[in-house]
Amino acid sequence: DLSALPTPQGNRGANIADMAAYNEKINPFKNGITPEAEAAWENRYLDFFKLFLKHKDKITRVTLWGVSDAGSWKNNFPVRGRTDYPLFFDRQYNPKKIVQLVIDEASK
């Protein structure tokens, strides 16, 4: 699962104060992803697709778990209200920059 968000780790426990800090830590982009985080996410995805293309003789398909960020199963997981940006199309179904980057890489 590729995500722009940090991966939750550790025991969250039952302390409400700890949970609030934890929720903020793993949901940093609830009002929109920063350009820096989006660029890092794009680079990570592109690195994976370069690897897939390098081994295209062994890989027959790549599955993405959804189309648009609006309907991603990663929203609200692992905590309610979490906003993720894991897919190739934004919440309005507009293609992200990664779509063209992958097309360009595959066309080489």
Regions found by a protein language model. Give the residues of each.
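Aromatic-rich peripheral "rim/lid" segments of glycoside hydrolase catalytic domains that contact
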Residues: L2-K108
